[in-house]
């Protein structure tokens, strides 16, 4: 498939032929993801930072919340929306999220062209070790990142490494021994590519990005509490106005809107996955009024909590 791809010199291959080869490679990788999905439960113990993505059902534009990670697709595509920003990720563009981020997403998938790929959680310790090995190399000069979500060209090097990762996942011993090293290789290519600054910001200290990331971690741990903008600004050691500006540059939304969206997503997970009643979920995430929660839930997701839960049950039944 991609055997010896590290040694191939794609620059001397005519573009049309190269694109045809890549398209065929991605189709084969999508098939491999589909086959591996049946083993995902056993694989999660061997490679906990890898999650396989596969689906044949399209989804209209809807609010989602992604945790930090790298998303690589081989088939199908998604379009994300954050305020005025629109970004597409597919077999040519990977997505990097460095903060937990609510946004709207549209999924394009069919049985003929499924959504297939993988998601890598970023292990901060592994990233720090990689940076220590790179050291003060003069060739490593990533630009600093301002946003928590970025996309970039899915290079031949990353695609080749992703293929080898899927390959070792077919054999438990290979997955356990070789998997983390291949993930490290993918991290290296992301770190030295266009999104390197965004990845570097995860372990940098005292930059605006790192300070806002610390605030987002506080929200993640304390979202049920009555958090004020003043408290969060103090956590970042910023004035309220500077905090607003820097928070929006990272998340593309205001602090209070982010907190509200975060609570709504957490409540939705409790309702859908834990079978919790809407009123109980509302109280659990910090709402004092169940009716206010239901209004804001419908305004954000476009359906009531009950309608959303029924829709998800129907989809799972199919």
UniProtKB/Swiss-Prot annotation:
Changes seen on gene knockout: Deletion of the gene confers sensitivity to glyoxal. The knockout strain also shows higher susceptibility to glutaraldehyde.
Any single GO BP term: positive regulation of DNA-templated transcription
PROSITE patterns assigned: HTH_ARAC_FAMILY_2 (PS01124)
Domain of life: Bacteria
InterPro entries named in the record: Homeodomain-like_sf, HTH_AraC, Tscrpt_reg_HTH_AraC_N
Pfam families according to UniProt: AraC_N, HTH_18
Alphabetical list of SMART domains matching this protein: HTH_ARAC
UniProt induction comment: In strain LY180, expression is induced by diverse aldehydes, including furfural. Induction may represent a response to physiological effects of these aldehydes rather than direct binding to YqhC. Probably regulates its own expression.
Gene3D superfamilies the record matches: Homeodomain-like
UniProt keyword terms in alphabetical order: Activator, DNA-binding, Transcription, Transcription regulation
Domain HTH araC/xylS-type intervals: 213-311
A GO MF label: cis-regulatory region sequence-specific DNA binding
DNA-binding region: 230-251, 278-301
Record function comment: Transcriptional regulator that positively regulates the expression of the yqhD-dkgA operon. Acts by binding directly to the promoter region of yqhD.
Protein name in the entry: HTH-type transcriptional regulator YqhC
């Amino acid at each position: 498939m991609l055997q010896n791809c590290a040694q191939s010199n794609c620059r001397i291959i005519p573009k049309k032929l190269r694109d045809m080869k890549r398209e065929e490679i991605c189709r084969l990788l999508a098939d491999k993801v589909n086959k591996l999905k049946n083993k995902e439960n056993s694989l999660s113990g061997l490679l906990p930072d890898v999650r396989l993505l596969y689906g044949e059902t399209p989804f209209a534009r809807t609010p989602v919340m992604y945790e930090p990670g790298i998303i690589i697709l081989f088939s199908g595509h998604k379009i994300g929306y954050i305020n005025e920003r629109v970004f597409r990720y597919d077999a040519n563009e990977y997505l990097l999220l460095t903060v937990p981020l609510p946004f709207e997403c549209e999924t394009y998938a069919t049985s003929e062209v499924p959504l297939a790929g993988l998601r890598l959680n970023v292990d901060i310790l592994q990233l720090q070790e990689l940076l220590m090995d790179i050291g003060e190399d003069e060739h490593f000069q990533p630009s600093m990142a301002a946003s928590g979500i970025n996309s970039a060209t899915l290079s031949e090097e990353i695609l080749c490494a992703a293929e080898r990762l899927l390959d070792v996942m077919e054999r438990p011993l290979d997955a356990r021994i070789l998997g983390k090293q291949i993930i490290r290789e993918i991290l290296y290519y992301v770190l030295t590519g266009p999104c390197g600054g965004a990845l570097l910001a995860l372990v940098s200290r005292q930059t605006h990005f790192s300070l806002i990331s610390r605030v987002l971690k506080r929200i993640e741990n304390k979202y049920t509490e009555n958090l004020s903008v003043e408290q969060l600004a103090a956590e970042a050691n910023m004035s309220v106005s500077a905090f607003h500006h820097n928070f929006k540059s990272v998340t593309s939304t205001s602090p209070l809107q982010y907190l509200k969206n975060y609570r709504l997503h957490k409540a939705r997970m409790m309702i859908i996955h834990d079978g919790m009643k809407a009123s109980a979920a509302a109280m659990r995430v910090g709402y004092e009024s169940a009716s206010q929660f239901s209004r804001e839930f419908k305004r954000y997701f476009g359906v009531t909590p009950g309608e959303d839960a029924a829709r998800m049950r129907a989809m799972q039944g199919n």
